[in-house]
Amino acid sequence: MIDIHSHIVFDVDDGPKTLEESLSLIEESYRQGVRIIVSTSHRRKGMFETPEDIIFKNFSIVKHEAEKRFEHLQILYGGELYYTSDMLEKLKLKQIPTLNNTKFALIEFSMQTSWKDIHTALSNVLMLGITPVVAHIERYNSLENQKERVKEIINMGCYTQINSSHILKQKLFNDKHKRFKKRARYFLEENLVHFVASDMHNLDVRPPFLAEAYKIICRDFGKERANQLFIENAQSILKNHYI
């Protein structure tokens, strides 16, 4: 499998704190069958402002150690880019990364961002000649039960991603992700999803659930659809090809 959304680089955002934590997280992903991981550390003004050279330095250490330790594993460079006018300018100047240096970029918003602001932001990114992959679309309140809005995003030329943790079955009690899981299922049933990715941060609170999610998609939507969501679509964009 291929994971295009992950926080595996130590000491740069809210992901791993140490190299060993990075490697333990990658080991679990590898155990689940992932062989390509795109590292997408946060870039968010006012919250995650680690200098780009530090992120790349720590990424390079993680890549070297992980690829040495795990056979046939590839770690690629990217970023989860929180949309602001500052981010747009940095993207234009190539100061922050797309996914594996392609024309595709992982773009994030706050849960409360309005539909109008999401639409405007994505239009602005598209005008740079960059195709947005909208991170975890199930988290945005303005898209809840709004298949027409998500269709519009896709028709504009964007792609969509949901988190593997939100594909898992709802817990009977105290499932704080219940709302996200309902939204993710809705988008899957409406065929409005291009990628499932882990958005993994650590092994205790936000681990990868790709193996379990893959089984559920196979069971409910078929193996062909599962392979598109977990492997084939990601293969395309990482080679800089449209889906």
From Swiss-Prot:
Pathway annotation from the record: Capsule biogenesis; capsule polysaccharide biosynthesis
This enzyme's EC code(s): 3.1.3.48
InterPro entries xrefs: Caps_polysacc_synth_CpsB (IPR048208), Caps_polysacc_synth_CpsB/CapC (IPR016667), Metal_Hydrolase (IPR032466)
One GO BP annotation of this record: capsule polysaccharide biosynthetic process
Reactions mediated catalytically: O-phospho-L-tyrosyl-[protein] + H2O = L-tyrosyl-[protein] + phosphate
GO MF term list: manganese ion binding; protein tyrosine phosphatase activity
Pfam families with a match to the protein in the record: CpsB_CapC (PF19567)
Keyword terms, alphabetized: Capsule biogenesis/degradation, Exopolysaccharide synthesis, Hydrolase, Manganese, Protein phosphatase
Main enzyme class: hydrolase
Cofactor: Mn(2+)
Family: Belongs to the metallo-dependent hydrolases superfamily. CpsB/CapC family.
PANTHER family: TYROSINE-PROTEIN PHOSPHATASE YWQE
Entry function: Dephosphorylates CpsD. Involved in the regulation of capsular polysaccharide biosynthesis.
Protein name per its UniProtKB record: Tyrosine-protein phosphatase CpsB
Organism encoding this protein: Streptococcus agalactiae serotype III (strain NEM316)
Source organism phylogeny: Bacteria, Bacillati, Bacillota, Bacilli, Lactobacillales
